[in-house]
Amino acid sequence: MATGIAAAAPANSNIATVALNATLNESLTVTVTSGTSINFTLAPNTAANNGSGTSTVVTSWSLKPGRNNIAVWAYFTSAAAALNPVTAGNTVTIPSSAVKIQVNGAGAFNPCSNVSPFNAAASGLQIGATSITGNTNINGARTDTLAYQIDTTVVPQLPADSYTGVLNIQAQTTP
């Protein structure tokens, strides 16, 4: 004889939740991946003393909506003294206008003599610009190759000495 056992209906628990929060921080970075030290053998009163190599500059970004442009600049902290003498008693400096940069192997070598957004000295050169168009390139990167010259005709009485300086490379996005 068979007895009927009724199947029990499923029982559901309450609903538990987990809140998920994710943040992608805005970033704009510049890295010199090669050519972090450039040497020059200078000749007096010579317009084109070439640097020993090139620098590769990578600018990468992850931006918030509303940004519309990225500008990459090379600049010195002083227009009058981009490179300073090593020898005590030598007070002659190489100005930023004597340092010239060619970008990506094309066009002229241009002096570092413009005002950058990073300091008021007329010691900079914009080396790149990227327009941001909506969300099509809000995350991206650009690579620029810089070649260098020092024009010693800018300082016709430049004494024999070693001269050292630091070229800053920085990017800015707007607005």
How would you name each of these model-derived features?
Residues 111-113:
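Sequence contexts marking disulfide-bonded cysteines in secreted/extracellular proteins
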Residues 7-109, 129-175:
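N-terminal small/polar-rich segments of proteins
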Residues 1-3:
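Bacterial N-terminal signal peptides
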Residues 115-127:
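Signature of long, low-cysteine stretches enriched in small and polar/charged residues
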